Each structure stands twice: as structure tokens, then as C-alpha cells.
């Protein structure tokens, strides 16, 4: 008996008890399972297509065609494209100086708006403020960003939104600052070819005080002649505040201000934005009443955009282009222009959370099962070999 007991004790010492959770084979198995679950979760993704995908594509295609016909119109006049400053050869980048150039301009911002996908971004913003078919919106434009003007108007066309536009013609560098091809000239070509549904209903000179201050007399006369050529009412008084008031009266003659579904400002026109708040603090994109009141300052002149927004009309502010496109993960001044329908603006790739949750449950359950099994075996081992340890 003593001999058998001794043999049994020797076998116990030679083969010590190891819980399953400490076995190398178990740990290797759990590691392999972890890697397998990770690979499945990582490689199983879903594509979330934007609900407004079709409208975005339509708007971008409209803008592509609109840019093409404007380029052809420009080329018919024997104009050469400056490839250095217009690398995508749109033919729609202005010059650094002209008689109707009002301010300095950011060339890269102008190039960014001459991407048809910018129209798709405008559609996204319009959807954010719940614009629908047959809604009427007020639009404030300048000649500084013809690409952004086109983007807004083609987005309106794609969504069947009614735009009521007032424009200031003066333009900053690289914008629609060619005396023989102003924004009104571009707008007319687009309207005649059915790329946009409406033209501007009135126009001003633009520039400082909205009256062309710092422009030469010849420059101001050229703008006024261009406005007269397009048979538009000229907004020109002796004060900025009166120019703003006249704009409000024109918009009110079409529809009561509170009945407009949105106010869209394109560019930095002083009549549009006024001087009643710090312009640099106004973020691009969707603007609500508090966004204006929080940055207000006393003594300034309230612009048209601010008056609309304070009347609880939703606003879209299309300026500070780099900050704006960062909201949509779009490239700044892209070369070449990206394809329509690609990028997170149209569809976003996401990890499949259901698959990830299932993998987590499988892995967590496996670890729990091994731990539970090990605990039971440890308890049995202690009862068999050291019964007093449980007391």
C-alpha cells in the first residue's frame, strides 16, 4: 500500500496540474481566434451612400456642363488659358488685375470652387437646412467667385429650388473680373442654355461701400454699362445702408422675408454681410440666428444676410472656402479635378458594427468559457488532492 501511494505521489509530481487557462495550447488558440475575429471585423465594411446621392451627382454634372459651355464661349473670343494660374484649364480663372478688380483674392479658393463636386457640397448644405422642391431662396452673389455662384445655382436647378438673386458685379483677383466677361455675362450664357433656372433681378457695382470705392471712374462706368446691357435695375444710392435697404425692398417685393426658406450668401460682399459683426468669426456653412448675434458689435451697419437670419430664415454662408470643404473632406485646389460621385461627400465607408459585435461576443464568450472551465477543474483538483484547502 505504501508503495502504491508513493508511485501515485511521484506521478503527481511528474505531471503537475495546469489549469486550461494557463496552458500554452489554450492561449495560442485564443490568440488565433482573436486574430481571426480582428481580420473579419477589419475587412467587413459597409458603404453608406448619401441619401442625396442622385441630387449631388445631377448638380455636379450640371456644373460640369455649365463650365464647359462658358469655357467654349470664352475660347470663341480667342482667349488663351493661363495654365500656371488655371491648371485645370477651366478658362474661368480671372486675372490678377483689371479695371473692375475690387480686392485681393485667394487663387486657390477660386480653383476649389471651380470643381463641379463643389455643387454637390452645396446640395448637402441645402439638405441640412431642409430645403425642398419649389422652395424659394434669396441669394446674394458677387463677381468674386463665379465657381461658387455656379455651384449654388446648379444645386438649385438639381433640387428644383427657386432662386431669387441679387448680384454685385465687382470682383476680387482671379474671379469674374474680365471686363468683357463679367458674372452677369456668364449668368446670361448659363440661363440661355438652361443650366440655371433664374438670372439676377438687380445688381450693384460692388466693392467698397458697394459703390465701387477704390475703383477708377472707368471701372465703375464699365460695370454700370454691363448692368444696363443686361437690362437690370442698378442699385446705387449715396450710402451703403441705403443700398442694403433697397436690396431688402426688392426681396420683399417678391415674397415676404419670413417666407423665404433660406438666405444664401456667396462671397464677401459688404452689402450682403454689412459691418455689424466680426466677419472673420462667422463660420462657413449653415448659419443660425445665434451665430450672428454672438459675434455682433455695436455701431456697425447690418447687412442683408444678417437681417434675413435675424428674421429666423436659415442661412448658408459660402466663404472661407478651405474651412468649408474640410467639412466634407474635399481636396483644396485639386489638380486634376476629382471624378464626380467619388469620395465621402457621396458615400462613406464604415466598419460593420454588427459583425464587430458578433466577433466580440464570440471572443469574449470563448475567454469566459475557458475561465469557467479552468475554475471548475481547479476546484476538483483541490478537492481531490487537498480537501482541507476548501475549508
Name the predicted role of every residue range.
Residues 3-19, 386-391:
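N-terminal Lys/Arg-rich, disordered targeting/topogenic segments
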Residues 25-42, 361-364:
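Hydrophobic membrane-insertion alpha-helices, especially the h-region
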Residues 36-51, 368-376:
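Membrane-interface motif at the C-terminal end of an N-terminal transmembrane signal
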Residues 58-117:
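N-terminal, Lys/Arg-enriched amphipathic/low-complexity engagement segments
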Residues 117, 123-129, 133-182:
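Membrane-embedded segments
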Residues 158, 164, 171-173, 180-185, ...:
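Conserved mixed alpha/beta catalytic, RNA-binding, or beta-rich assembly cores of soluble enzyme
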Residues 180-259, 263:
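A substrate-binding/cap region within the structured catalytic cores of diverse enzymes
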Residues 269-270, 276-391:
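C-terminal functional extensions of proteins
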